[in-house]
Amino acid sequence: MGALEVLVSDILCEAGLKKLDVRTRTALELPGYFRATKKWDLIVISNGALVLAMEFKSQAGKSIGNNVNNRSEEAVGSAKDIWTAFREGRFGQFPPPFLGYLFLLEDRDNVKTPVANKEPYFKVDPEFGGEAQEKGKRGSQHKGVSYSKRYELLCRRLVLERLYTSACFLMATNSARTKITQPAPDLTFQRFVAALQGHVVTFLGSRGE
């Protein structure tokens, strides 16, 4: 993920931000509402204004199923926390910051296989249900969707519900010649960068820079 952070930092500087305002290593703590502070992965502070805050998350290995819900809860909670802190004036009288979420998932067979949902009482959201199987004694059964699809839905809904300004979902093989794919056309790195650049241009324009 370090390479992606460097790439995004370079893009921000090319868009007109000062290099010293873009932070990726130290002093990344921002105030919250439900907790005192949270350490973000990349933030931009310019002339006292919070321009943007970003999360870079990744998932690799065989035990991916144990972490999907944790990642989802973390993403939603962090966004709710910082937006409430913004509402309460923790970041001064400035326009809303850009909140970005980038997720990189290891591309392997077990993340592309449908995973059944446990539904002892109620049916899950149809988007997580997947394709319908043959009808059984309890009616239509569904295969469920893969872990990669679950992460795709997470990223899409984080933006749909306005928890994050923009999100990006990437998959990459763990090999000598890494192959990167972008499963969802609405969650590509190009679209993410375009939204990021647009926010920076608007911010600098409001400052007359």
Where are these regions (language model features)?
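A short, highly charged nucleic-acid-interacting micro-segment common to nuclease
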Residues: M1-V8
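A short acidic/basic microdomain associated with nuclease active sites
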Residues: D10-R35
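Low-complexity intrinsically disordered segments
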Residues: S9, C13, K19-L20, T173-E209
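Acidic, metal/cofactor-coordinating or nucleic-acid-engaging core segments within structured domains
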Residues: G65-R177, T181-Q182
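Short helix/strand-bridging catalytic loops that position acidic/His residues to coordinate divalent metals
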Residues: E29, K57-N70
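Active-site beta-strand-loop-beta-strand hairpin of nuclease catalytic cores
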Residues: A36, I43-A53
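Glycine-rich, often proline-containing surface loops adjacent to acidic residues and nearby aromatics
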Residues: A49-G61, G100
